[in-house]
Amino acid sequence: MRKISIITERRADYSRFLPIIKEIEKNDDLEYSLIVTGNHLMKKHGYTVEEIKKDNIKIDYTFEMFIDDEDSGAGMSKALGIAINKLPDILKHQKPDLILSGFDIAANFAITIVGAHMNIPVFHIQGGEVTGTIDESIRHAMSKFAHYHFAANEDACQRLIKLGEIPEHVFDVGCPSIDALLNVKDDSTVLNRYNLTTPFFLVLQHPVTSEFGESESQIIETLKAINQFENYDSLFILPNNDAGHEKIIDKVKASERKYVDALGIADYVNLLKRSSGLIGNSSSGIHETPTFNIPTINIGSRQSGRLRSNNVFDSNYNKDEIIEAIKSAIDWQGSIADKVYGKGNSSSQIVKYIKELDISSNIIQKQITY
């Protein structure tokens, strides 16, 4: 029996862990223990721990990491510190054989650091990708702590190897969030439940930590651009709690646009595939929209450098540029997107490797390969 520790902080990581957890549940020789923290436990971000419960996923531990809810880089640093402080005792109690961490999210960064210090093998999902914000540094730092790497494409694999990781410990498995998307049941009632008319845009714009002071002006430009498309409805999903989020939330709430604090995976998928495009700077616009051939209007630097499909139309934070990108996206509708992040079989591959790979003390001590 291999025991696996997993932590989730927000929808962005939970949506990718969910299909893996479902796959783990099919195996009698595997057992997971889930730690829930961060946005999941915050009312202002939708208290999405309830979505996890609705999915009938077993929750073993919870703790709050955003104690002060401080909208700054200092607040993010404090939250990371809290998670690093809380996790050793949880892991001592869990006694996992391995940790499955992912992406570039703070709670996952924390468990990766703690696991490495406690000599617990760390399996990291989606290392090797290039992004904007502090996420760029976090992701690559996690890769250096991790022992095995489940990359989303060959481009990311090669970058991990160039970072000095052992090539035999790097695997191209695709993006597991696509597995989750394809498993969602179609729900034709979703538009009525959110009072939406077609055509409409989904909008998800997060703050950029390295551009902390500009989040207000950035969302203003996006709102101005969307207002030019009078025949299109819209639904804003409020941002994560990275530094600068309060300004975005205030401006969205002050506008006449519809908004929600958060969406569960099922509603998000059913809205996304019925939309005319995803506007903003979410990684979902890079990883997930190609699955349903939905165009993405990607604004700013947050996803800078990431491998993207032909459905992505980039723009700076400028009203006129955003308008042109939206027009291009509308013209693109009906086309087929390249599937550069896999086709929905990532979870089974990841679980196969979890069962088979060496987790003995032989792999704990890492050394750069050059």
Question: How does the language model describe each region?
Answer:
Residues 1-370:
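Nucleotide-activated sugar donor-binding and catalytic core shared by glycosyltransferases
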